[in-house]
Structure formats: C-alpha cells, structure tokens
Amino acid sequence: MKKIAVDAMGGDFAPQSVVEGVEKARNKYPDLRFMLFGDEQKIREILTSDKNIEIIQTTEVIDMNDEPVKAIRRKKDSSLVRAAYAVKEGKADALFSCGNTGALLAAGLLIVGRIKGITRPGLLSTLPVLTKEGGAFNLLDSGANADNKPEQLYQYALLGKYYAESVRNIKNPRIGLLNNGTEPHKGSKLTLEAHNLIAADSSINFVGNVESKDILKGVCDVVVADGFTGNAVLKAIEGTAGTAMHLLKDTIMSAGLLGKIGGLLLKPSIMKIRNKMSASQYGGAVLLGAKAPVVKAHGASDAETVYYTVKQINDMLENDMLSKFTDYFNKNV
C-alpha cells in the first residue's frame, strides 16, 4: 500500500484544510495511507477518524517568511523536514505540502534527492485550457529555477511527455517550447539551442515554438520554458484570471438595478467560467526530476484542493511514473 507524507502545518489554513482534504481523499482511496506531520493536538481536534492515518508529532513549522535553505537546515523538527525525511528513508512514497514553496523545493532537492541524470528538476504546473472543449496543459518549469541551460529544457520536454502520458493518459502528447514567436529561427540563444535538441529527438511529438498568447487555447499538451519565464507566465495567468473576475463583479454591482438583475440571470454562466479558469481541480505543482513525487499545493488551498492534489499523487503512484522516468534517464543520460 502506498503512503503519502503530509506537511500538515503548511499553508494559510493549515492544519484545518489539510486534514479535511486528507480525510476526504482517505474515504475515496481506501488503499492509500497517510503520515500527517505536525501539532498532534491541533490535528486531532479536526480529525474525525484516524483510519489509515498516522500522526507524527513535530515541534517546529517553516512559515512563508523563512529563508528556504536555512529553514531546512535549522528547523530539523519542522513538519516539512520530517515529512521529507520519511520519503528519503523509504517510510513514505510521496511528499505533499501547501507551505513555503522554496522550502519544499529545497527539501525535495536536498533531502529527497534527484534522479540520476537530471541536472535541474523542474516544477510542473497544470493549467486550464480556456476553450469550449476545455482540457488542460502542463507548464514546465514554472518556477523551480531562475536560470536554465538548453539541455535542461530538453530534459523538461522528456519529463513533461512522461507525465502527460502516465498521469493525464494522453497518447503521444504535443510538446511546445515557449518563445517570442512560432518561427524556428526566433528566440534567444537558450531557446534556439533547446529547440534543436528537442526537435532532434524523434520520440517527442514536438510542435515547435508556441507563444504565451496561445497556450490557453490548447495548442499543445506540455509547454516547456525556463523557470524564470515560466513563473512569470504562470503568475500573469493567475493574476489576469483573478482580475477579470473582480472586474466583472464590480461592473455588475455598479450598473444599477437592471445590471444586478442581469448579473443574477448570468450567475450560472459566470460560475461556469470561474470554474473553468480554476486550476484547483488539477491538483498541485510537481517537482519533476526528484526521486519521489514532491507536490506543492497553493498556500491558500481549501480542503477540496487538497483532495484533488492527493488524487493527483495517487495517479502518479498508481501509474508508476517515477520508475519510467528513472529507467529512461539511467539508460539514456
């Protein structure tokens, strides 16, 4: 039976949302086991049943203001560090946190470790496709690294391909390289060299360069980017979506009685748009290239988002995604 090590104290609404989400997932996936690291008293005040759940008492918490690497090294009894060591020592199969992103990435790299051959693990996020048909795409790297080399972007193309195949069940996923134009000759030295490396691998269904204005239209299944650019794109998408919904609400509320009546009539459609723009149903961001699944959900995650993130981790474990990664890179890198 697979076991997930959970940082129960990480996140804006921890441990409440974490425990509630884990319990919902436990009820849905009876073969999963959970190790909850954190303040046992606070956890038990929320927990309705400890079936398939083990609580490990810790005395420290890494908060959002802590410097990641220092916190990992100094707060040895923090819920995140203890959870990471549980994975490293083989007591758990995956690591999950809603807490400090940098600290989780540091724990993934320094404690869990990286797959042999992977020089820079990347952070993979799943985002919605905003077309009538719907769907989603993966963005990799979405913020684990500020600088990348062409070889690393090529590795991201491979990692994204295996993730899309194993977890999202997409056959022959389309891989695109984020650039400032679709023409092969456009881009920086980094993207030009990365383009050549990816295009040379016949095992990758490479659709070429893609522009940021098109990725929400579903032009590819996996978007490859350096971490700096990928993170900027991710935050621009999140910010635009949030701003658009606020603008729509403010416009309706300031339009007088007729505007409010119109808004009431449009409410079901507006809710559909909001739900389509939400990425919570796809789970968290995955540190691809680590020796085990290391998954980060948003700091403001509610119980529903925690549940979907556990579902995502369960899919990764059931499909044996890490073995496929490891076998490939051991043989080819």
Swiss-Prot record:
Gene Ontology CC: one annotated term: cytoplasm
Metabolic or biological pathway: Lipid metabolism; phospholipid metabolism
EC number(s) from the headed UniProt entry: 2.3.1.274
Location of this chain's protein in the cell: Cytoplasm
Presence of keyword Membrane: no
Catalyzed reactions: a fatty acyl-[ACP] + phosphate = an acyl phosphate + holo-[ACP]
Keyword annotations: Cytoplasm, Lipid biosynthesis, Lipid metabolism, Phospholipid biosynthesis, Phospholipid metabolism, Transferase
Keyword field contains Ribonucleoprotein: no
TM annotation in the entry: none
Top-level taxon of origin: Bacteria
GO-annotated molecular function: phosphate:acyl-[acyl carrier protein] acyltransferase activity
Family classification: Belongs to the PlsX family.
Description of how the protein assembles with itself and partners: Homodimer. Probably interacts with PlsY.
The protein's role, per its UniProt record: Catalyzes the reversible formation of acyl-phosphate (acyl-PO(4)) from acyl-[acyl-carrier-protein] (acyl-ACP). This enzyme utilizes acyl-ACP as fatty acyl donor, but not acyl-CoA.
Protein name, per record: Phosphate acyltransferase
Organism: Ligilactobacillus salivarius (strain UCC118)
Gene (name only): plsX
